[in-house]
Amino acid sequence: MLTERKEKIEHFKKEAYYKVSLSDGKLTVTSESIPSEMDAEELRKLCDGTEALVTRVKREQKKTFPPKLYDLTSLQREANRFFGYTAQKTLDMLQELYEEKMVTYPRTDSQYVTEDMKETVKMLAEGMADFLPFLEFGQIMGNINRVVNNAKVSDHHAILPTKEAMEKGMGGLSGGKKNLLMLIGQQLVQATGEEYLYEQTEISVQCKEHEFTAKGKLPVQMGFKEVEEAFRKYCVKDKKSDEPDHKTELPEGYEEGMTLASVKAEKSTHYTSPPKMFTEDTLLAAMETAGNKEFDSETEKKGLGTPATRANIIEKLVASGYAERKGKQILPTVAGCELIHVMPENLKSASLTAEWENQLLMMEKGKIQEDEFMNGIVSLINEILSLCRAIPEEERNRFQTAREVIGKCPVCGSDVYEGKTNYYCSDRSCQFALWKSNRFLESMKKSMDKKMAVELLKKGRTHVKGLYSKKKDSKFDADLVLGLEDGKARFSLEFPKKKK
């Protein structure tokens, strides 16, 4: 997924498109996207200064339902979005909160609670007014039925704050754990809150047989969003909301059949945008739904990984050098891209996961036997090994890191490369090496850097500043001179005469 997204971005070609807007001084209506600049300009000229007719004014009462309670993945996503926490950091802090009896079991894939928990959840929701510093009691509705669904709770219910957390308070918690606990608490209040109600107005205008529209949105009841905004203001002060503005007001007084006299027409240029690089938030979402179209309708476990393993999968990719973090983004490394390039197609597809999840489900229902399942696994492994053996040598060489030659060996004349701890001769039979940490330099509080090594190999000496004299307890400058003894490096100091 990471490499596919990177390739889409790299190969993306920006394309221009155009829109024409009409205005009578109060109301502005806009056309659909127009691919051709010439067509857009013709429409602008055609409509500019002419009359336009209001053909429709549609007003609708709409609602947005409250969000669900958190399972592990949705909480990890929100913690990344609001606070920049990695999925692993969120899981680690949640585990600590769980062990401190401040939250319920974190490794859950359910966003609901069971019928027998209604009274407990009601008590927790009502207690949030005192527990969360940014809430008022009037913001708590306690519509518990919305979060109750026995059929959608398997082993563990949604993540909730505990009664013990409300009794202890958040005073002794670190900033990160406090943020998570407030996030979980406000989600409980949102999930049991009222709907967000708004009036949506759409005005359609016709000019020269072309349609132009404007949409407006006015909140009627903020509902659960009032809690969300209070949380943002208190906990995410320096972060702009990524939610669209609640209010987009259209001017009053426009009705069907009205004529707009002498409208002004303007053309605007827009550009298509490439897909965005994954953040931990969006990657977790993609992992959760990956390959869903390829899964059998009866398959219970879908996506890549489970709520408990997705964070670890991401961390392993980073630790293995196949992915890296840059700010909030997660990017594939060169090694990661090369690996995907040579990997067999079936290993890259979520359909492989789908196939084996279906096999496990069939075994659970007694439709296939364990031996049949294991034979399939062995067969798949043998197939993968055969494919890997068939990878051409030039493709395997993609993973060999190009080594930089920093100089020639003064003993045998072979190339010298940089290693983790030294600069070594490429001839394995030669003992020559310049060690980054050696007793001679360490006694003067210095180590061998690449610049020094290059000059020693080229000139036999390098000027070093800031050497330390223990005897005089002071620093001095000198030339480090390379000598050889039995094919090994030996060092001495020389003090060049100062120019008069």
List each language-model region with its residue ranges.
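Conserved phosphate-chemistry cores used by DNA topoisomerases
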Residues: 1-96, 100-102
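Basic, low-complexity terminal or inter-domain segments flanking catalytic cores
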Residues: 8-11, 17, 87-88, 92, ...
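Short amphipathic alpha-helical interface patches used for protein-protein assembly/oligomerization
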Residues: 103-109
